[in-house]
Design a protein with these regions (language model features):
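A short beta-strand motif characteristic of beta-propeller blades
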Residues: 42-50, 87-98, 134-141, 195-202, ...
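Short loop/turn segments that connect beta-strands within beta-propeller blades
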Residues: 81-84, 129-132, 232-235, 277-278
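Surface-exposed loop and turn segments in beta-propeller and other repeat-based domains
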Residues: 94-98, 183-205, 284-300
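Hydrophobic or amphipathic alpha-helical targeting/insertion segments
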Residues: 103-151
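Beta-sheet-dominated scaffold domains
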Residues: 2-7, 115, 165, 205-300
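A short loop-to-beta-strand structural motif that recurs across blades of beta-propeller domains
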Residues: 76, 123-125, 226, 270
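N-terminal beta-propeller domains
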Residues: 1-87, 146-229
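Repeated scaffold domains used in trafficking and secretory/extracellular systems
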Residues: 52-61, 95-110, 142-153, 207-211, ...
């Protein structure tokens, strides 16, 4: 006998079978839920031919009506667009191959239409003209002998986190540029120049800085075990930093996403969501245990 179960209660891995509400299921595979129904997920198809390098990171970049994929590996950078797609090597022409690794990967973003990427070992790279004939190049005005683990854009500024200067690592340090004009990159990162807005600030508390994501007009900075809010104030300090959550940080770079004004973050032991003031776990009991048990020890 077939019976229609309404209302559909979705996937629930926490409760035992005898405790499940009517219409709930305990596991599923190759389906997705939409408008209260489960439907077959149709799978995937190749959008492009095989990338010439093992891809460590990929960034979509739009110029006009054209979308490029900027793909970065351990030593090379490629871009691809169009159909049929053609992969083009856009590795920097000065400085040789890159020195990225699976431990550092690549990060960055796009500010004012200019992509900037960073691997924590080499000087940050920018794509001055988004075109197959233009290779990446070292970010102008970036200070010599300085690297950072993570770079992110916010407002008209670029931010660098977990900074190393002349071989000395400052894992709590936030460094920001002078604001960039539209279509350009920053003209200065010199925190000692009183005519510029560039600056530095060290966040207190245990744990290193891991990553940062905008949330409205606030940049949320995640350390390993705490979270800070960075807001623009102008004046002599330019930015204000204040503690937001203690005991809640981010597990690794890119372990967070913003959806409809809410951050969803993979912490050291949970997945939480917050709106900048209220924080809430979205896992419960068995699901949390399953997630932590099944993290890939090799890749993590």
């Amino acid at each position: 006998m077939l019976q229609k179960l309404t209302p559909f209660a979705g996937l629930n891995k926490d409760l035992g079978v005898s405790d499940l509400p009517l219409g709930a299921i305990t596991d599923c595979n190759n389906v997705r839920f939409r408008e209260g129904y489960a439907e077959l997920f149709l799978g995937q198809a190749n959008a492009y031919t095989t990338c010439p390098i093992p891809p460590y990171s990929a960034f979509p970049v739009r110029t006009g009506s054209t979308i490029y994929w900027l793909v970065l590996g351990a030593a090379k950078a490629y871009c691809v667009t169009g159909a049929p797609a053609t992969w083009t090597n856009i590795t920097r022409s000065a400085g040789g191959d890159y020195s990225a690794s699976l431990d550092t990967l690549w990060n960055g973003g796009v500010l004012n239409g200019v992509p900037v990427v960073n691997n924590g070992v080499d000087a940050p790279q920018y794509w001055s003209t988004i075109a197959t004939g233009t290779p990446l190049a070292a970010l102008p005005s970036w200070p010599a002998g300085v690297t950072c683990r993570v770079m992110r854009p916010f407002l008209n500024y670029w931010f660098a986190f977990d900074v190393t200067k002349a071989g000395t690592r400052y894992p709590h340090r936030v460094k920001w540029s002078h604001p960039a004009e539209p279509g350009t990159v920053p003209t200065s990162w010199d925190e000692t120049d009183a005519t510029k807005d560039a600056g530095e600030f060290d966040l207190d508390g245990a744990g290193f800085i891991v990553d940062a994501m905008p949330l409205g007009n606030t940049l949320i900075v995640y350390k390993q075990f705490s979270t800070y809010a960075c807001t623009y104030t102008g004046g002599s300090y330019i930015f204000n930093f204040r503690p937001l959550f203690s005991g809640i940080g981010m597990m690794a770079p890119d372990c967070g996403v913003e959806i409809d004004g809410t951050h969803y973050v993979f912490t050291q032991s949970d997945i939480v969501r917050h709106d900048g003031s209220q924080v809430q776990s979205i896992l419960d009991k068995a699901t949390r245990r399953w997630l932590l048990k099944n993290i890939d020890n090799t890749q993590y």
